[in-house]
């Protein structure tokens, strides 16, 4: 399953100039890294249903690797996958790839693609503000390869999370912080982060 997703992603990369991808801090996960990351999770053999969040899903490589891993666990029969992606260039590929995963998996896979800014769409919830959701959605598993870029300290994403932003913030650190917020108690999160800047 993952091989096909990687093949389609490589076609996208060849068609999209690096300058355009860099504008979004867009770097795609390799097949080996995606499988390694999905292999880090521990699954309760008694669980029949899991919820998964992939924020900044890109082409869906990490989601697909995670689904592929769940294929090996008989007890898990139902997967609820939420993917955030707001890059209009990659969204058609993400939709195509996740549709392919739905066709290939033997599990009941429910996919929700949120075409919104992952951070800004939840800042009211994160900051416990009026208008926010008092009980925001939490996930059993969070996986991610967030955008790699520094943002100005007055960028909307930085001002949306003042609790975690000091100085010149990195967007990937903000994504990881929101990922922890989205994680349910006893949940697990695996992210690719640059330790040099944290």
Question: What are these model-derived regions, one by one?
Answer:
Residues 142-149:
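Amphipathic alpha-helical repeat scaffolds
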Residues 98-130:
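S-adenosyl-L-methionine
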Residues 196-198:
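Conserved small/polar residues in nucleotide/adenosyl-binding loops
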Residues 160-184:
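Glycine-rich S-adenosyl-L-methionine
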Residues 1-75, 82-101, 122, 146:
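Class I S-adenosyl-L-methionine
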Residues 152-156:
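Conserved ATPase-coupling elements of RecA-like P-loop NTPase cores
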Residues 126-141:
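A short acidic, Gly/Pro-enriched loop at the edge of an enzyme's catalytic core
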């Amino acid at each position: 399953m993952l091989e096909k997703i990687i093949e389609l992603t490589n076609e996208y990369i060849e068609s999209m100039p690096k300058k355009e991808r860099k504008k979004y801090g867009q770097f795609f996960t390799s097949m080996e890294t995606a499988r390694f990351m999905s292999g880090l999770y521990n699954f309760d053999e008694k669980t029949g249903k899991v919820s998964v969040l992939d924020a900044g899903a890109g082409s869906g490589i990490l989601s697909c690797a995670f689904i592929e891993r769940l294929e090996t666990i008989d007890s898990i029969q139902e997967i609820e996958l939420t993917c955030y992606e707001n890059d209009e260039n990659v969204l058609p590929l993400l939709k195509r790839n996740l549709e392919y995963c739905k066709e290939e998996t033997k599990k009941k896979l429910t996919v929700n693609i949120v075409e919104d800014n992952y951070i800004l769409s939840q800042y009211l919830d994160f900051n416990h503000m009026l208008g926010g959701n008092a009980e925001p959605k939490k996930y059993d598993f969070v996986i991610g390869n967030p955008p790699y870029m520094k943002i100005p300290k007055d960028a909307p994403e930085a001002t949306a999370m003042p609790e975690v932003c000091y100085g010149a913030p990195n967007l990937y650190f903000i994504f990881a912080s929101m990922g922890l917020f989205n994680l349910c108690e006893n949940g697990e999160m695996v992210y690719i982060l640059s330790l040099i800047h944290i």
